Amino acid sequence: MMLKITESYKTAVISTAHVTAADSERLPIACFDPLDDRGLNWVHGTQYGWIVRAGMRGNDWKEELRDYGISQEAISNIQAIRDAGYDSVQFDCDAELVDGMPAWDW
């Protein structure tokens, strides 16, 4: 059977070390919560990190993350992933570090 998929996106899976310790406390607040319709509907928590679907937001995503207190360093790392051709980034504590990308040991 041939599936007809009309929408897809490309995700990079990278270490949670590519966000600061402060970001690791702020990202859960930015994550969408469908029970109370709070947070950004393109940022999602996982058991081991977060998925940020910045490519689904046009140009407003940086400002929206800043509004939640996400650091410029983390935003720059997400932009680097976007510039490499990815639509979203999954920060996972078990994923590898990306050579040349700023990271923090927290």
Language-model region placement:
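A short, structural micro-pattern
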Residues: S8, H44-T46, D83-G85
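A broad, low-specificity signal marking well-ordered, structured residues that form hydrophobic/aromatic
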Residues: T11-A12, W50, V89
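Structural motif
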Residues: I14-A17, G55, F91-D94
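Short, surface-exposed beta-strand/loop "edge" segments at domain boundaries and coil↔beta transitions
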Residues: T20-A22, N59-E63, E96-M101
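Short, compact, well-ordered microdomains
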Residues: D67-W106
